[in-house]
Every structure is written in C-alpha cells, then in structure tokens.
Amino acid sequence: MPLISIQNAFLAFSDLEILKNAVLYINKKERISLIGKNGAGKSTLLKVINKNQELDHGSIIYQKNIKISYLKQDNPKNLDISIYDFIKNQLKKENNKEININTIVEIKKIIKTFQIDKHSLLSELSGGSLRKVVLGSALLSQPDVLLLDEPTNHLDINTIAWLEKFLKKFSGTTLFISHDRSFIQNLCTRIIDLDRGKLTSFPGDYKEFIKLKKENNRIEKTKKKLFDQHLEKEEIWIRKGIKARTTRNEGRVRNLKVLRKEYKNYKKIENFNNVIINEIKNYSGKIIFKLKNISFFIEKKTIIQSFSSIIQYGDKIGLIGNNGSGKSTMIKILMGEKKIQKGSIHFGTKLNIAYFDQDRSTLDSNKSILENVNNGREKIVLNGKEQHLIGYLKKFLFKPNQMKCLVKNLSGGECNRLLLAKLFLKPSNVLILDEPTNDLDLDTLELLENIIIKYSGTVLIVSHDRNFIENTVNKYWIFKGDGLINTHFSSHNNIIKEKNKKIQKKYVLNPIKSNISFLKTKQNQVKKELKKVLNEIEKIENSIKTLKIQMNEPDFFKQHIKNQLPIVKQFNIEEKKLEKILIYWENLEKKL
C-alpha cells in the first residue's frame, strides 16, 4: 500500500488550474523530484500533501500514523531565538512530546556538522547558515515522508554534498522541489512532472527525463497542429450554414461544439521566445579589473588576503566557496560598494555593469511588474531597436493580465524572472550575477545559461549550482576561507575531485619535510615572478595610455607621415607585448 495516494485531484485559484484530475502515489523509500515551471503549483502540491491546503475535488489518502515533516521555501519569521532552542522547539512541535537525552545528543551533533555556534541567535546568521538550521530541524524529526521545498537554496557546495549523502541514507521517503540539476541527478529515484495541472511520472534519471519531455512536447505540438487544422475545417463548414441545419448533420454540429470547448480549455506549452540581452560590444578596454595585492578585513577577521588578478574582456569567472568565505564581499568591492584596506584596484574604461542582486533590492515590492521595468514606460530600446514593453515581458512568460500585479504578490521564481527582464534591458559589457539561479525553474536556468554562453562581454558569477557554473564559466576563483583565494582554469568537477583526493591523502601520506620546503620555495619563486609581471603589465599599460593620448590629439593625423609612424608602430609593439605578458601571467597563476 502506498504511503500517500492522491486520486482525481482538482485545485484552482481563480482561472489558474493547479491540479486537473491529477493522480499520484508515493511509496516507501522513494526519493521523488517534483519538477515544473515557476507558477505551475509545485509548492502548492507540497502544501496539499502536508494538509495546509485543501483540494477543491478529489481525495488524498494517508497510511495510518504516517509522520510528515515539511521544509518550507521561506525561512522562519521569529529570529530572536538561539539555534539550539529553535531546533528543540521545532522537534517538540513535530513530536508533541518532551525531548529526550538521545535527541539532545543528535541536535548537538547536527549543529556541530554545520559548524555553527549553538548559542548564536538566528538573527545573527547568514542566509545560508539559517537555511542549514531550518533544514537540520526538519531532518532530525525522523519523519516517514520528508517534504523539501528548494532545500539547496543559499547552501554552499559542501553542505549540498553533505545533504545528498544524508538523504541517500535516510530510511524514509523524500519528495523535493529543486532547480539544482546535479542534486536531482545524484539523488532522485523518480521524477514527477507537474505541467498544466497534470502529474506525469518518469524514471529517476534527469538527463533521460529531459529527452523524454522534449519528445512528449514535440508530439503534443504535432497533435495540436492537426487539431487546429481540423477545427478550422469544421468552422468553415458551419459558416456555410444551410447544410449544417439538416437533421443528418446535427451530430457534426455537436462534435464542433465539443471541439470548441477543447480548444478553449487547451493550455499551450509555454517557452521562452527570442530573449536577448542589451549588450554593448567591443566598447570597454581589454582590462576590465586589475587587482593588485588587495586585502579586506572586518574588525580582526580577514576576508580577502593579498589577492592579485587581472580580469580581461570576455572572461567568465565563477566564484566558489563556503558561505561567509568572501564571495559577495568581492562582488561588492568590484561594484565599488566596499573599499579595500590594502592593495590597489584598477577599473577598466567605459565599463557598463549589469548586476543581479540575490536580495532583489532593485525590485520595489509595492510597485507593479510594469512599473519596475523601464519605470512603466510603454516603449523600450533593445540593441538599438524599439519595441513594446508588454511584448518584451511576454518573452519572460508574464501574461498581459499580470502586468499590473504587485511584485510582493509574485512567487520567488517570478521575481527572479522579472529581475532578469530588468537586467537584460540594461546596456552592458560586464555582468555580475550574485546567486542568479535561486528559485528559477529549469527552463529559465537553461535560458540564462545560453545567454551567458553567447554574451561576448565579461561575466562574474557567484553560484552554488554546480551544473550552472560548469556550463558557463572558463575560470574559477576558489575562496578557501581565512582570506585565501586560488585561481583555477580546470572544470568545477575536476576541482572537486582534486579536493577529495587531497582530503584522502591528508590521512594516508606522511610527506618528507624536505619535499614540503622544496614546494614552498618553488611557490615563493612563482609569487615573486608574479609581482614582477604585474609591475611590468602596469608599465606597458601606462605606455599604451601615453601613446593613446598622443594619437588622440586633434592634429596628430594632420602631421607628416614620418612623424606619425614611430608612435603608431610603438603603440602596436606595446599592444603585442601586453598580449604576450598576459598569457605568461595566466600560466604563472596556474602554478600556484
């Protein structure tokens, strides 16, 4: 017998159908991934299963004495409580009884795993740490069915890996919503697709699901095309009038009425269509940012320690590290919102930065969708072409009747789609994206990936979505903690493998001290050489700058060619020198 059975379920809010004659069986020890577009009703379905939302029609049957634990997408509102007391209170509420000594031990153990002080207040925690605590309380209640709504949001990569291992060992059933494709692929035993009110079951292989889903959509579009052709033919027939009134043709008239009803109820497959970004091409210089021995501290804590790097036009850099390791701080430094205490930053010329803020601070929750984008003006200009704002927003799957909807009434995914619509409208040659994948459905993720891949400017991304990072960047800044940042040119998967090997070797090998000192000496030599190279780069750039000033003089090209040539030749020589030395600098960084 299934743990939970949903039969002939109907649920609608106004004209939006969430469930339409839906059927679902949830069995023991399953790990089910619930997939669907933003606004399809995934979170609502979890609320139905958790008895927070009633069905309009249909039935839901639970196995006797079943225990369900539910991790919501939103964090708790009361934050003036210690971590330990919060988890203890949640468990009391779940179990309806006092906590025993074994549970206290388990609470302390899980808090230790998350590396957080148990006496800290929830209000003192970062978004990621708070998510860990809420997650911990849900896991400790030992339910038969665990409902998780976007459990990986705000979690760092190490914690996501820990969660995967935990859920694989978990003896109960898990039903989860997630946009993290690696998490889905590694974990689920079955996929449930919620699409236009229907629930369809697929085998638990995400890559195979994508193939099957695309094939299903292709077949559906073909059927719809044939249906439309048949309906059109019948409409032409009925308009002829006289023949349709005969008794013999009454059945055909009735069939036409059925076809019209089917057409009215039909919900088409919605996909992003021709979304482009307002890109300024070849407008900035080759060097976007040059960081030289930069350091940043908060009181006595080192966030960034003596970091040097050159970001060139076209670089796509992924910022990876645990929560609190300094990724968002680095973004704010590059945005000019925070000042470094040591070192220097050179900002490139004519930079136009488009910034995706994970806190959505650029959206006014009390204004409508239209008012938030382009200040509500009807026309927009995208890559030099004028178009209607409503037509532009429809490409991001916003319907015309939603345009006056207030942002505070939108789902998390809809807010992020709106933020992307606003971001792509801004003319840019640099994209800075701080956790852009949170709350996005899988189709929107794919759209964002494709846009970043095609974008010819510079991109910096903070994300814990392993697939997203792997598919979009060509260089990594690995934030180690204690201010240390390493640059890698390998793929993210290789970085993780390398890290795991090092952890294993740490407990197996006992390297000879002389080898360690040799490696340190070699590393110090590379660091010295890097300093020399950075100084040389600075000299060449200053030389290019001086030559440019001379060449930009109004009368420069009016003078005799003999006077022009030496300066133009020298300019070309310096440009080539800069190209070569930048390649040498990148190779040196790889050796660190």
Curated annotation (Swiss-Prot):
* UniProt cross-references to InterPro entries, sorted A to Z: AAA+_ATPase (IPR003593), ABC_tran_Xtn (IPR032781), ABC_transporter-like_ATP-bd (IPR003439), ABC_transporter-like_CS (IPR017871), ABCF_ATPase (IPR051309), P-loop_NTPase (IPR027417), Uup (IPR043686), Val-tRNA_synth_C_sf (IPR037118)
Q: Which GO terms describe its molecular function?
A: ATP binding; ATP hydrolysis activity; DNA binding; ribosome binding
- Domain ABC transporter: start-end pairs: 1-221, 289-516
Q: Which residues bind ATP 1?
A: 36-43
Q: Which GO terms describe its cellular component?
A: cytoplasm
**Function text:** Probably plays a role in ribosome assembly or function. May be involved in resolution of branched DNA intermediates that result from template switching in postreplication gaps. Binds DNA and has ATPase activity.
Where, per UniProt, does this protein localize? Cytoplasm
Annotated gene: uup
Catalysed transformations (reactions): ATP + H2O = ADP + phosphate + H(+)
Per the database entry, which stretches of residues form a coiled coil? 516-550
- Kindly give the Gene3D superfamilies that the UniProt entry links to this protein: P-loop containing nucleotide triphosphate hydrolases, Valyl-tRNA synthetase, C-terminal domain
Reported EC number(s) for this entry are 3.6.1.-
Which keywords appear in this protein's UniProt record, sorted alphabetically?
Answer: ATP-binding, Coiled coil, Cytoplasm, DNA damage, DNA repair, DNA-binding, Hydrolase, Nucleotide-binding, Repeat
Q: Which residues bind ATP 2?
A: 321-328
The similarity comment for this entry is: Belongs to the ABC transporter superfamily. ABCF family. Uup subfamily.
Please identify the protein, giving its name as recorded: ATP-binding protein Uup
Domain comment (free text) = The C-terminal domain (CTD) helps bind DNA.
User: Which coarse location class applies to the principal site listed for this UniProt protein?
Assistant: cytoplasm
SMART domains linked to this entry: AAA
Any one Gene Ontology BP term: DNA repair
UniProt region (C-terminal domain (CTD), binds DNA), positions on chain: 518-592
